[in-house]
UniProtKB/Swiss-Prot annotation:
Catalytic activity: GTP = 3',5'-cyclic GMP + diphosphate
Segments on the Cytoplasmic side according to the record's topology features: 455-1073
Lineage: Eukaryota, Metazoa, Chordata, Craniata, Vertebrata
GO BP term, example: cGMP biosynthetic process
Organism, scientific name: Sus scrofa (Pig)
Encoding gene per record: GUCY2C
Main location: membrane
Keywords, comma-separated and alphabetical: Cell membrane, cGMP biosynthesis, Endoplasmic reticulum, Glycoprotein, GTP-binding, Lyase, Membrane, Nucleotide-binding, Receptor, Signal, Transmembrane, Transmembrane helix
Locations listed in the record: Cell membrane; Endoplasmic reticulum membrane
Transmembrane portions of the chain: 434-454
GO MF term set: ATP binding; GTP binding; guanylate cyclase activity; peptide receptor activity; protein kinase activity
Domain remark in the UniProt entry: The protein kinase domain is predicted to be catalytically inactive.
Domain Protein kinase: 489-749
Superkingdom of this protein's organism: Eukaryota
Name of the molecule in the record: Guanylyl cyclase C
Length: 1073
């Protein structure tokens, strides 16, 4: 047994992986006058027709469609393609194993690209639901079956056999009826019999009635499932049974088998659901005795009429399953005809969603579909006449109008007085009971009058004994300065919000409390308001915040309320850092939060306060133990209700409060918790005022509500999703109360720990353990972020100051100036920089300097030098400080200067094409002092005659030349590197007199592509020559149409921001050392 199941599971997984993106790759065979129907021929069907018969029915339907289109003047081709399952894995006749088969058929269509205009089938609920769950099915699907609730509200699914939803609506309506001559009592209880031998339709009908969150279950005060024949037979004569009504599904033979000739209590009513059986309408059919206390719910033959007498020639040509396949083909033909006549495309989404709210001509007559694509029809409730032993129509139910019409107002029932009994045993209109009730009523009336008088006396006495008084202001203490509001793990903590919150927090009776503004000026409360405040004082429940009283501060009245450390539930949902989804806010925790709110509201509704009136996620707070508590309840006569996203639609239209309105608000909060999105999240609308307007003015069967994606919900989530949707029903009477919500969530919550009940302490300890583990994870994560930010700050500091200087500043707070015996200093500037600026915009100048200096910085990375600063077009570099390197300082500066000069020979300005950029370079070696100057924006500066001499060497040099002093040449001669240089001659240096200087031209055995210096020796001739070059470059730019760079606040916008300001420019920090 395990091997087939394992193979089936693996096959299902492979199919799901293969079908994830199926719809986008399938091409429809639905164009150019040729239209196909894809029929899924599934072996795994529990319905009473062979595949050969179904194929014949579909082909007959296609012929009818062709004839109808031809009569309408539409010459097109309509065909049906039949897709069969292959292999031996699908041989079971059980619909429960049809999941993989349906996906396999879709895979076949996908791989062979045979998708038609519409899918016909499958019929099994399991298969249909899985296809919609695992694929993005954007094509219309017509099903002869798919009865389950899980297939409700699918946008492209059409069902041509009555689904379970229609059955539930009838039962709820019939249970409510109490004004028919034969049914004077409304029913609120039922037993539901279910075993493992039901047909496919019965299985899903009874499954819907069993579901705890279904519409039927919500309306009953008692419902119990009977499983197995023994339980059914025991309940028939059980004097202690809780209901007289038993619902079952099957045929008359099923009733006979279960009863087995046993006696049945006279007030027992069996409701037999047998929708697709025409046995009851056949001629000469006599109802057996065991059917006399049975009411049969069925569908009439397609050609019958709605009255109590049956024609003798009524019979069904085909069974309902075959007829549904035939009508499915005719439905497609009807829609195809409409679209072709309008000349609209049938491959669009509009066609897929068009199978709604229509009536078409079926094989046996008109067929009507509702707004969900489900078939509408008229159900018959039959009874057995004790006079004629014939089946007769008791009433009819129109599923489209939800209307029950009594047909036989004087039925000849087997039950007493020809009336249906009460659903609760022992209740009925007996004369003795009437007398007892009359006497009891008189006594109760007298007692009621006495109680009213006593209650009024007690209330007046209580007000006299405890007149409302405020808490003395001197008992309210402000928070101390070292007390914080909350613990936050966010690095960018919002201090402004913290200040606002502190204004509302105080201490009372050594406890931290919140002051709630009651919008009351003088504090002279009315008697009604005092009663409300007294009720609040009496509430003490662990899921409700404690109310301590009121206090008057600064001519304002505040309510003093218990403080919860973690803030509102809305803040917790927004804080994805402290409460992440993956490790903390999981599905179990969300269920526990919903359970906490439900318990608090259930207690509040059963208390004297009775209603909240302002329930929303900001009025649900979380304490230090991760327990959710409800606050801001009561005081409805003091604080007027407001219109917001949590307000029920009936209260938006007319301002008031109610318990059912609280249930609606709970549903909105639940959607916030489940999706962890903003309040009333929906993709179709973002504006808050528009949302409120659409909720208030919504009408029809599908009112405006937030998004809750049932299609993608997991199996464990589906029951909660349905519960939430029931909470925001438009009709308040259809919403469950909080007691039922609490019980449903208690059952779901217990399943997480394989237990039905968990103590409060167990829940509390488990939550704190979960939060502790999450806190450890967050602390570790924040520590890593802190270290990363610290390293980032260090890298930035190392770019601004030398590493040794930064460490000294961090450790000692000061940097001692230091004298260096011998260093080499480099200066350079741009020749004609002012002239270039004259013909350039400011942003072009910035771009030019950025392009040049970032290239210089890259060159510095390959030498042991330290960039001191840049001022305008001047560029200063030193070697031998702050880290001493022997005689290497002169070598590194000399090679760096050669690399820079070589680069300038290839550099070209973007906004002045063809213009060479000339630089002058000066180098000098000698002693130097260095230190940090200033407190704000500290700079590492160099001092001494060596700095001035190096500057003079640059200023007295010539374009595209490296001007070197004699001291530097002397050092280079002492090294192993054989530098090439030329004697310039005697040069006058301001402050030093005349000295012999040199031109550095290269290194032996190394090639440097140095640019050729300009030939002019006269400075004025050089300047004139340079101006001519600029003019020529401007003419060239104008002729070639080169545009200036777009002005921007960030230079080099097209290439990125200034690279020497970025921290991650290079991992090589040798630039500075």
């Amino acid at each position: 047994m395990k091997t087939p199941l394992l193979a089936l599971a693996l096959w299902s997984l492979l199919l799901q992986l293969g079908l994830t993106f199926w719809p986008s790759s399938v091409s429809q065979n639905c164009h150019n006058g040729s239209y196909e129907i894809s029929v899924l021929m599934m072996n795994n069907s529990a319905f009473p027709e062979s595949l050969d018969n179904l194929k014949a029915v579909v082909n007959e339907g296609v012929n009818i469609v062709r004839q109808r289109l031809l009569e309408a003047g539409l010459t097109v081709t309509v065909n049906a393609t039949f897709v069969y399952s292959e292999g031996v894995i699908y041989k079971s006749s059980d619909c429960r194993s049809s999941t993989c088969e349906g996906l396999d058929l879709l895979r076949t269509i996908s791989s062979e690209k045979r998708m038609g205009c519409v899918l016909l089938g499958p019929s099994c609920t399991y298969s249909t639901f899985q296809m919609y769950l695992d694929t993005d099915l954007n094509y219309p699907m017509i099903s002869a079956g798919s009865f389950g609730l899980s297939c409700d509200y699918k946008e492209t699914l059409t069902r041509l056999m009555s689904p379970a939803r229609k059955l539930m609506y009838f039962l709820v309506d019939f249970w409510k009826v109490n004004n028919f001559p034969f049914k004077p009592f409304s029913w609120n209880t039922a037993y539901v019999f279910k075993n493992s031998t039901e047909s496919e339709d019965c299985f899903w009908y009874l499954n819907a009635l069993e579901a705890g969150v279904s519409y039927f279950s919500q309306k009953l005060s008692f419902k119990e499932m009977l499983r197995g024949n023994e339980e059914f037979q025991n309940i028939l004569m059980d004097q202690n049974r809780k209901s007289n009504v038993i619902i079952m599904c099957g045929a008359p033979e099923t009733v006979h088998t279960l009863k087995g000739g046993r006696a049945v209590a006279e007030d027992t009513v069996i409701i037999l659901v047998d929708l697709f059986n025409d046995h009851y309408f056949m001629d000469n059919v006599t109802a057996p005795d065991y059917m006399k206390n049975v009411l049969v719910l069925t569908l009439p033959p397609e050609n019958s009429v709605s009255n109590s007498s049956f024609s003798k020639d009524l019979s069904l040509v085909k069974n309902d399953f075959t007829l549904a396949y035939m009508n499915g083909v005719l439905l497609f033909g009807h829609m195809l005809k409409i679209f072709l006549e309008k000349r609209e495309d049938v491959t669009t989404s509009k066609f897929a969603h068009a199978f709604r709210n229509i009536t078409f001509e079926g094989h046996m007559g008109p067929v009507t579909l509702d707004n969900c694509g489900d078939i509408d029809n008229t159900m018959f409730l039959l009874y057995t006449s004790v006079d004629t032993s014939k089946y007769k129509v008791l009433l009819t139910y129109d599923t489209r109008k939800n209307y029950t019409n009594p047909v036989d107002k004087s039925p000849t029932f087997i039950w007493k007085n020809h009336k249906l009994p009460n659903d609760i045993p022992g209740r009925g209109p007996q004369i003795l009971m009437i007398a007892v009730f009359t006497l009891t009523g008189t006594i109760v009336l007298l007692l009621l009058i006495a109680l009213l008088v006593l209650r009024k006396y007690k209330r007046e006495y209580a007000l006299r004994q405890k007149k409302w008084s405020h808490i003395p202001p001197e008992n309210i203490f402000p928070l101390e300065s070292n007390e914080t509001n909350h613990v936050s793990l966010k690095i960018d903590d919002d201090r402004r919000r913290d200040t606002i919150q502190r204004l509302r927090q105080c201490k009372y009776d050594k406890k931290r409390v919140i002051l709630k503004d009651l919008k009351h000026n003088d504090g002279n409360f009315t008697e009604k308001q005092k009663i409300e405040l007294n009720k609040l004082l009496q509430i003490d429940y662990y899921n409700l915040t404690k109310f301590y009283g009121t206090v008057k501060l600064d001519s304002m009245i505040f309510g003093v309320i218990e403080y919860c450390e973690r803030g509102s539930l809305r803040e917790v949902l927004n804080d994805t850092i402290s409460y992440p989804d993956g490790t903390f806010m999981d599905w179990e925790f969300k269920i526990s939060v919903l359970y906490d709110i439900a318990k608090g509201m259930s207690y509040l509704h059963s208390s004297k306060t009775e209603v909240h009136g302002r329930l929303k996620s900001t009025n649900c707070v979380v304490d230090s133990r991760m327990v959710v508590k409800i606050t801001d309840f009561g005081c409805n006569s003091i604080l007027a209700p407001k219109k917001d996203l949590w307000t029920a639609p009936e209260h938006l239209r007319r301002a008031s409060v109610s318990q059912k309105g609280d249930v609606y608000s709970y549903g909105i909060i639940a959607q916030e918790i489940i999706l962890r999105r903003e309040t009333f999240y929906t993709l179709s609308c973002r504006d808050q005022k528009e949302k409120i307007f659409r909720v208030e003015n919504s009408n029809g069967v599908k009112p405006f509500r937030p998004d809750l994606f049932l299609e993608t919900a997991e199996e464990k989530e589906l029951e909660v999703y349905l519960l939430v949707k029931n909470c925001w029903e438009e009709d308040p009477e259809k919403r469950p109360d909080f007691k039922k919500i609490e019980n449903t969530l208690a059952k779901i919550f217990g399943l997480f720990h394989d237990q039905k009940n968990e103590s409060y302490m167990d829940t509390l300890i488990r939550r704190l353990q979960l939060y502790s583990r999450n806190l450890e994870h967050l602390v570790e994560e924040r520590t890593q972020l802190y270290k990363a930010e610290r390293d980032r700050a260090d890298r930035l500091n190392f770019m601004l100051l030398p590493r040794l200087v930064v460490k000294s500043l961090k450790e000692k707070g000061i940097v001692e100036p230091e004298l260096y015996e011998e260093v080499t200093i480099y200066f350079s500037d741009i020749v004609g920089f002012t002239t270039i600026c004259k013909y350039s915009t400011p942003m072009e100048v910035v771009d030019m300097l950025n392009d040049i200096y970032k290239s210089f910085d890259h060159i510095l990375d390959h030498h042991d030098v330290y960039k001191v600063e840049t001022i305008g077009d001047a560029y200063m570099v030193a070697s031998g400080l702050p880290k001493r390197n022997g005689n290497r300082h002169a070598i590194d500066i000399a090679k760096m200067a050669l690399d820079i000069l070589s680069f300038m020979g290839t550099f070209e300005l973007e906004h002045l094409p063809g213009l060479p950029i000339w630089i002058r370079i000066g180098i000098h070696s000698g002693p130097c002092a260095a230190g940090v100057v200033g407190i704000k924006m500290p700079r590492y500066c160099l001092f001494g005659d060596t700095v001035n001499t190096a500057s003079r060497m640059e200023s007295t040099g010539l374009p595209l030349r490296i001007h070197v002093s004699g001291s530097t040449i002397a050092i280079l001669k002492r090294t192993e590197c054989q530098f090439l240089y030329e004697v310039r001659g005697e040069t006058y240096l301001k402050g030093r007199g005349t000295e012999t200087t040199y031109w550095l031209t290269g290194v032996k055995d190394q090639e440097y592509n140095l640019p050729t210096p300009p030939t002019a020796e006269n400075q004025q001739r050089l300047q004139a020559e340079f101006v001519d070059m600029i003019a020529s470059s401007l003419q060239k730019r104008q002729a070639s149409g080169i545009k200036n760079r777009k002005p921007t606040r960030v230079a080099s916008y097209k290439k990125g921001t200034l690279e020497y300001l970025q921290l991650n420019t290079t991992d090589n920090e040798s630039t500075h050392f």
